[in-house]
């Protein structure tokens, strides 16, 4: 019995990114159903996106693990489903103010990043250096860039790292996003041999995982007022400007491709990715990843908005004009 319990605890720690991924899904669903006033039951169903990722990973693992790990995976999946059902049918609403929700989000985002840091460090100090070095810097540029370009604002938080306009919580959130997404992708690569040989395929999986996470997260954040979108952005999905989801995909794909290309080319484990030489490579390629992200983003929005005169470019033009520049 002791041996089995020790094995289960090791599985819990090993699968902390997956458990964290599901915990975030439950937390978002809880806020949507119980804490928003009035409740946004129309958004509750979005838990299917992170749950689908979990189900796909459990299915991919099925042939590669023993009976205990299969039971563990099934328990995680069914347990999460039971909690979600219980919250919808049995839990009583407990409305919270915007300030209370914001405070809870801010604390949980920073605590989550700290937990991620401990998990990464226990796996490898070099892996922690990768996520709290270049990954953190890349995320900070993304978050602050969106604000500086005029697409959204993030006000009312208690902790800012001046002179950056983005709060510490949302910048730290990118560390969590990339760590969870990359950890899930590495698990998929272990189970699917052809994926382990394809950096592009793996980057697409990472992007899909990130979008499944954001399809649930951003509708809540928008409804709760965690960030405020520019009023010109009228093309929406799940109550969120379509631009947001395109931005996530455009940000995650090139950066994850850069990391996964290094791993595939060198045939190394994730724990070795943060070695000194690879860290230098990643730091040097951040500008290239940002450029690729910008090209993907603006090209995609031009397609969705039918040209370069849509809301995305109107916001950009207004912002540049405020900075004393112009597109034409």
Model regions and ranges:
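Aromatic-rich, lipid-facing transmembrane alpha helices and their immediate juxtamembrane interface loops
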Residues: 2-328
């Amino acid at each position: 019995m002791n041996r089995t319990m020790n094995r289960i605890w090791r599985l819990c720690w090993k699968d902390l990114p997956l458990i964290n991924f599901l915990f975030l899904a439950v937390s978002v669903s809880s806020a949507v159903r119980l804490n928003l006033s009035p409740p946004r039951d129309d958004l509750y169903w979005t838990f299917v996106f992170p749950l689908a990722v979990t189900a796909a990973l459990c299915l991919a693992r099925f042939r590669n693990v023993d009976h205990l790990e299969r039971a563990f995976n099934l328990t995680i999946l069914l347990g999460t489903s039971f909690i979600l059902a219980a919250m919808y049918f049995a839990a009583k609403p407990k409305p919270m103010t915007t300030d209370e929700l914001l405070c809870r989000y801010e604390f949980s985002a920073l605590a989550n990043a700290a937990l991620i840091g401990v998990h990464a460090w226990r796996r490898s100090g070099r892996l922690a250096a990768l996520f709290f070095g270049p990954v953190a810097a890349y995320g900070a540029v993304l978050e602050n860039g969106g604000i500086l370009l005029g697409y959204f604002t993030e006000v009312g938080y208690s902790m800012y790292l001046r002179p950056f306009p983005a709060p510490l919580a949302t910048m730290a959130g990118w560390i969590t996003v990339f760590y969870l997404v990359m950890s899930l992708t590495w698990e998929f690569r272990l189970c699917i041999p052809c994926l382990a040989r394809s950096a592009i395929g793996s980057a697409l999986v990472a992007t899909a995982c990130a979008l499944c996470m954001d399809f649930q997260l951003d509708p809540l954040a928008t409804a709760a007022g965690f960030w405020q979108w520019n009023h010109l952005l009228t093309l929406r999905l799940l109550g969120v400007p379509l631009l947001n989801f395109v931005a996530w995909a455009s940000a995650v794909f090139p950066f994850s491709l850069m990391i996964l290309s290094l791993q595939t080319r060198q045939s190394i484990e994730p724990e070795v990715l943060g070695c000194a030489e690879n860290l230098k490579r990643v730091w040097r390629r951040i500008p290239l990843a940002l450029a690729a992200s910008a090209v993907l983003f603006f090209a995609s929005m031009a397609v969705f908005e039918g040209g370069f005169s849509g809301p995305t470019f109107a916001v950009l033009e207004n912002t540049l004009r405020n900075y004393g520049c112009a597109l034409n």
